[in-house]
Amino acid sequence: MEQAPEDQGPQREPHNEWTLELLEELKREAVRHFPRPWLHGLGQHIYETYGDTWAGVEAIIRILQQLLFIHFRIGCQHSRIGIIQQRRARRNGASRS
């Protein structure tokens, strides 16, 4: 006979609330690294494409995550995880001038 699952602790936040909190965190971080007019244009593009829908929220989250990842990967001056340009140039044996 089937039984109800045991209580597994406190219930997690609703998915929608978590998604909106993630979007706010990404927006705060993006403003630190990219020009506001550029981010505004991105937001306008998403709104014109998706309207005021969850698909639009998911799209802008995905785009901001990708942009920030690439930005950090190529060596953001605010980041401790980025590649430092001089090291990369030496490692490849190339010099930039």
Swiss-Prot record:
UniProt keyword annotation of Metal-binding present: no
PTM remark: Phosphorylated on several residues by host. These phosphorylations regulate VPR activity for the nuclear import of the HIV-1 pre-integration complex.
Location in the cell: Virion; Host nucleus; Host extracellular space
Keyword Glycoprotein in annotation: no
GO biological process per UniProt: DNA-templated transcription; monoatomic ion transmembrane transport; protein homooligomerization; regulation of DNA-templated transcription; symbiont entry into host cell; symbiont-mediated activation of host apoptosis; symbiont-mediated arrest of host cell cycle during G2/M transition; viral penetration into host nucleus
Region described as Homooligomerization: spans on this chain: 1-42
PTM annotation (Phosphoserine): residues: 79, 95, 97
Domain of life: Viruses
A GO CC annotation given for this chain: host cell
Database matches in InterPro entries: RetroV_VpR/X (IPR000012)
Family annotation (Gene3D superfamilies): 6.10.210.10, VpR/VpX protein, C-terminal domain (1.20.5.90)
Principal place of residence: virion
Subunit annotation: Homooligomer, may form homodimer. Interacts with p6-gag region of the Pr55 Gag precursor protein through a (Leu-X-X)4 motif near the C-terminus of the P6gag protein. Interacts with host UNG. May interact with host RAD23A/HHR23A. Interacts with host VPRBP/DCAF1, leading to hijack the CUL4A-RBX1-DDB1-DCAF1/VPRBP complex, mediating ubiquitination of host proteins such as TERT and ZGPAT and arrest of the cell cycle in G2 phase.
Additional facts recorded: HIV-1 lineages are divided in three main groups, M (for Major), O (for Outlier), and N (for New, or Non-M, Non-O). The vast majority of strains found worldwide belong to the group M. Group O seems to be endemic to and largely confined to Cameroon and neighboring countries in West Central Africa, where these viruses represent a small minority of HIV-1 strains. The group N is represented by a limited number of isolates from Cameroonian persons. The group M is further subdivided in 9 clades or subtypes (A to D, F to H, J and K).
Protein name: Protein Vpr
Species in which this protein is naturally found: Human immunodeficiency virus type 1 group M subtype B (isolate YU-2)
Gene label: vpr
